[in-house]
Amino acid sequence: MADTTIPENALSVFVDSLDKGNVRVAELYPGDSPHRQPVHTVYGGAHLFKADAASKLGALALKALTEYAPDPATLATAIGLDPAVADRIYRRVVDKLTREPVEDFRIDFEDGFGNRPDHEEDGYAQIAANEVAAAMRDGTLPPSIGIRIKPLSEEFKRRSLRTFDLFLTRLLERSEGKLPPNFVVTLPKITAPEQVAAMASACDAFEYWRDLKGGSLRFELMVETTQSIFASDGTVALPRFIAEGGDRIVAAHFGTYDYTAACGITAAHQHMVHPACDFARHVMQVALAGTGIWLSDGATNIMPIGPREVVHRAWRLHAEHVRHSLVHGFYQGWDLHPAQLPTRYAAVYAFFLEGLDAASDRLRNFVEKAAQATLVGEVFDDAATGQGLLNYFLRAMNCGAITEEEAVEKSGLTVAELRSRSFAQILQLRIKK
């Protein structure tokens, strides 16, 4: 008597029908991106941007740290850190602010710039492009940079795309036709998928007329309207946005204050940890999990300016907001003032160091099981989880929370394996040995 009941020819009918669905899911959800995600984006008005902006911000951040937290104990008290953790991270924060104070900068033609006469915005678009080109020549750009244009609403659509074109045209003229590494355009206040489609079309057109390689221009979405959470028919809006933007979309950034205002929340209660914000961020996570699109949280708008106790209160609030983001799976956020950089890195470093031992055990065990399964011919279909565990170490190492040597020691991986940035490739390398 046969061990199974369903005949093979009958089984094949519905098993084969799964092919299209499984392929579609694999294409839509490739897993976490192995590329380096910045831990923050620093925003600054386009009229203020200079080629040496990153180093100047670093100097101001170091000055703030030296003045308001000159030692680990003071920093621990100011932002509520375990003193032992503060001892471990303090020199690392100083080193980061000296070596690479800004990971990502956004030249802002929207809220940070305001509404100005057309000739004025035209001029600043070209001046900002000149400064970026100069920074490219001088080697003073942060690892990632971009511009935020105005929304593609009826009021601003032509103004927005003119700034996009003016900036890029001048930049390519002054940079021998090259874009900066990791250049991105930020599209704000999206209310309809057609706006995302138009942004993608503008990128297509610019690349065509300037003879740029297809896909060179990438953009990120601001999620700061209720229409970017749910569409008018009640469906989640982000999948449609992503479909319209295609492979050009690299990130989705949450806009705390516009979103809470759109929800009718009064100014006194518009802040990062409002339950309405958690809801929106969780919708973003569910909609974009596994797509490889980065998520970024918003900004703390209480600036660390004034007497020592005022700065310390602002620092503690900022550190709490950063930690809230990290705990909820948002590994990037916005900084609006140079004195927020010390607390950004302190909070991020503390977060990664606190979870390092547990992450180390999980990754070591996971790699062993995955390699064994593959070695004996079994199908290992959880590479996405492995990439997520690997990304913990890559994030910690990239931002400066741990050194490459510490990552090798804790992860059980070799330098070559870590630098591959790919869990699947690590498995292949181990099987070949």
What are these regions (language model features)?
Residues M1-K433:
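Expand to "…catalyze enediolate/carbanion chemistry for C-C bond making/breaking, isomerization
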